[in-house]
Amino acid sequence: MSKDEIFKENMQSIADFTFSKNVASVFDDMLERCVPLYQEIQRMIVEMAVDFSVDGTNVYDLGCSTGTTLLNLGQNIQSNVKFIGYDYSEEMLAKCKQKLVEHQFPRDYDLICTDLNQGVHIENASVVTMLLTLQFIRPLRRDMLIGNIL
């Protein structure tokens, strides 16, 4: 895992944060250092998803970033499900695909680049996760996104 040093140097001005290639390359380190109990959150998501996943359905990860949650779900869910990861950043999805390939992810999956602010098509879902994603959705669009899930 690459170490996050993106904001180490002094900057004249700070641009808007984006999920760029530089961020994608250190994102896992960023989460480990900046999100208290991140591994425990992952463990709890997997525990609940295992209980709710149903054979023949889809498991969605909205804002899948580098694929950590998808990987953990795929290693623990025993049901015959398809995994679908959505993210707005092509760089994050590239890192996600790389991680799934490196870990020889044996499950059926799709990775889709889309702006969750525009809504998302959810069908035949038994589990939908949105770990640390909703805060990046515009407040006026959150109800619509949640409605797409329900």
Task: Give the location of each predicted region.
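N-terminal, positively charged/glycine-rich alpha-helical extensions of SAM-dependent methyltransferases
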Residues: M1-V26
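Conserved alpha-helix/loop element of class I SAM-dependent methyltransferases that forms part
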Residues: L37-D55
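Class I SAM-dependent methyltransferase SAM/SAH-binding core
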Residues: Y60, S65, T69-N117
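Class I S-adenosylmethionine-dependent transferase superfamily signal
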Residues: L73, N148-I149
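Short conserved loop adjoining the S-adenosyl-L-methionine
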Residues: Q118-E123
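A conserved beta-strand element that flanks and buttresses the S-adenosyl-L-methionine
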Residues: T129
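Hydrophobic adenine-recognition pocket in adenosine-nucleotide-binding enzymes
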Residues: T133
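A short, conserved alpha-helix within the catalytic core of class I
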Residues: I137-N148
